[in-house]
Amino acid sequence: MQKHWLVIAAVLAACCIGLVSAQTDAGTNETTNASITVTDQMVEGDAVVGNVTVDEVVSNGTGCIVIHNNLFGHPGGVIGYTPVESGTNRNVTVTIHTFVATDTLFAVLHHDAGKVGVFEYPIPDIEQKVEGEIVIVPFNVTAENATLLNLTSLCPGNST
């Protein structure tokens, strides 16, 4: 009978350890397997709005994939976002404002930590992190029906 209780205790302990390790640490927003896969692409749309496609988003919990323009090599303003489910999401279409889009964009994965289904930035829907790093991927875009900005070329003294 005592072996029976030891087995039950061991199984319960293993289950609890598994649940704890799979959770996000709310204090640091650390996740273990969050990721983004996105390839360079052409924006589908016109000079005002268009769509980009994120090949794959793996999110720990519900969240949003957010597209930022490029502000001198760093994420600038938010130009589009769409919700994602917990787990793997494939071929995620994000509608963006092409009139403020740059030729390099950043895809950033955010938690849905506030009102469910509403993107509340910058808080409480902060970026997901893995090993202390924000889950972010830059990608290049072109467009046939819109002029994309290149802010680096607009810098004073930059001849490119």
What is each PLM-predicted segment?
Residues 23-48, 135-150:
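Transition segment at domain starts
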Residues 111-124:
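Short acidic/polar inter-strand loop motif in beta-rich domains
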Residues 30-76:
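Short, surface-exposed binding/anchoring microloops in extracellular/periplasmic proteins
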Residues 1-28, 160:
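Secretory targeting signatures
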Residues 53-54, 88-98:
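Exposed aromatic-hydrophobic patches
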Residues 77-87:
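Solvent-exposed serine/threonine-rich low-complexity stretches and specific carbohydrate-binding patches
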Residues 102-114:
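Short, aromatic- and glycine-rich surface loops/edge beta-strands on solvent-exposed regions
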Residues 51-53, 58, 119, 129-133:
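A composition-driven surface/loop motif
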